[in-house]
Amino acid sequence: MKIILSTDFSEENKVLLPYAIDFLKDAGGEIIIFHAYMDNVFVGSNSYPGNMDTDNYFTTEILVELEKNSQQVMLEKTEYLINLIKEEGANNITVRPVLVSGDPEDELIELSKKEKPDLILMGTRGKGGKRFLEGSLVKSVMTKCDVPMLFIPNNYSWRESKEVVYATDFSEYDVDTIDRIFNILKTYKPHIHVIHFVEKPDNQDEAIKMEELEQAFLEKEFEGEIHFQLVHTDNA
């Protein structure tokens, strides 16, 4: 199993590390620590004297320093993760750092296409407490990466991921997606609760669709349990 752990080097992202280790400690695998730092700085044309070459200035001063700093922090984060793995006695897990310059969105998508990971692990907040899930990066990555993604809130304490709620709108991809969830979480033998919200409790069309989805799993072999339920709500 291969996991891409995408980080901005913030303290908030430390919550990702125990999950990455726990997913792999039984079967083994590789954790790719990924970080992309911006290699372009935009400055207003009237910010400096007209005879100053701002492109060269930022290339030789700020951007070079940014690269050095990113390399140093990546080394520290990699060593920290390796030490955590050793403490867990998980000798079957390897760590590979990937540090690149460029747009984080584009670089993560390209890395995903190249490495074909089983899972991308990300935080929901970055430096300065920015709400990552409200940004455009995550929306783009989710639509352009054909890879399962797991987002962990920064204030969430690690625990076994056993109880899973899967909200379905009866997509043709439901069976494949649920199979992937079982595969990723097989270490925990998860209990997956498949739910669909309906405004009318006696909606027969929705009931039939849920029954068909349930039938698809009757003869499947998987580690864990799966339950199906229609949930009545006035605000579906």
Question: Model-found features: residue ranges?
Answer:
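Gly/Ser-rich helix-loop-strand patches that form or flank binding pockets
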Residues: 26, 106-157
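Short, flexible hinge/linker loops that cap or flank conserved catalytic cores
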Residues: 89, 158-159
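Small/aliphatic-rich secondary-structure junction motif
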Residues: 1-60, 162-227
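Residue-level recognition of beta-strand->loop/alpha-helix junctions
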Residues: 35, 99-101, 153, 196, ...
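Structural beta-alpha unit
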Residues: 41, 68, 72, 76-120, ...
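Residues at secondary-structure transition points
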Residues: 11, 61, 65, 99, ...
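A short acidic, glycine-rich active-site loop
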Residues: 55-72
